[in-house]
Amino acid sequence: MKRHTAVWVASLALLAHLTSAYAAQEVRATRLGQNPLITVDTSLTLGGNVNGPTVIRVPDWVDRPLGRYYMYFANHLGEFIRLAYADSITGPWRVYEPGVLHVRDTAFYRPQPDPKETLADFYTHVASPEVLVDPDRKRLVMWVHGWSTNGERWPNDPVKALAWARQAGYGQFTQAAESTDGIHFEVRPPITKLSYLRVFQHDGYFWGVSRLGQLSRSKDPLASFEVGPNPFRDGPYANRVRHVGLVVRGSRLHVFFTAIGDAPERVLMSTIDLTSDWTTWRASPPIEVLQPEMRYECADMAVTLSEAGDVDVPVRQIRDPFVFEEQGQASLFYSTCGEQGVAGARMTIR
């Protein structure tokens, strides 16, 4: 019996080793030598917080672009979406200080100022930009999130504010906007009741993966997304997925993500088989892609459990992965030291 047990354990160990070796070959990230690309000190307009990068190659039909590449990002408590531009993804990146898409022009605005008593959980902001380049209609579609309360001001008391929001069905939701130049955006009325939306196209739909790993979909990128199942349900990262980056390879979706409660928070990757009905989609056990190892990622700080929400001091965490692909080359962008900057890495996905 002991011999059979030993053989079984050895077999499991071999399987784990082979699985680990395969995973290591599947995704490899090599940091850019120019890191960090942006920090909170890059511009006074950044307000001490940088997170949620999204990078695009500026389309040829945009007149007089600021640069070849645009990076949209946010201050977690910010009043507008930030924009940086460069002629190479390695930089140098320069901040377009006026920014784009102010919160006052979205559904996430209300009479100001916000009550000081509620600022820990309730604050007027616009963040987590996701951008789709639509070459057929020569437009950019941007999705952003913020507190949606139908323009109403919440109660001054934090406990009453939370109860009020729950009773009214309010929350941090998503709205879409359009632009022909990447700088001037016009919002569209529909609201999707999810936040941190990332989008990919497949089988005639625009599919979304949002905070906590929640799925959604729509035929029209400007419409409200239908909320569906969660492929991370019943797994080790159920209700922990923070922000995702998405890559489609045929009928396989690669989901890069970081998780609330990890120590340290780091970039992981799971895959989802898209061939079946979306109600049956499941995320595979994740592999590690990148964790804080460099000084600009605060690797010299103590390891602590990450928490939900914003973080206004440097911490040993990397967050908010985004994958940009151009001419067969994938690049991973991510937030450093929690929410103190943006760095990048070249990446191979097999």
Regions found by a protein language model. Name each.
Residues 22-128, 132-243, 247-314, 325-350:
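Beta-rich carbohydrate-recognition and catalytic domains
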Residues 1-9:
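Bacterial N-terminal signal peptides that target proteins for export
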Residues 321-323:
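Short, surface-exposed beta-strand/loop micro-motifs that present aromatic residues
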Residues 9-17:
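Bacterial N-terminal signal peptides
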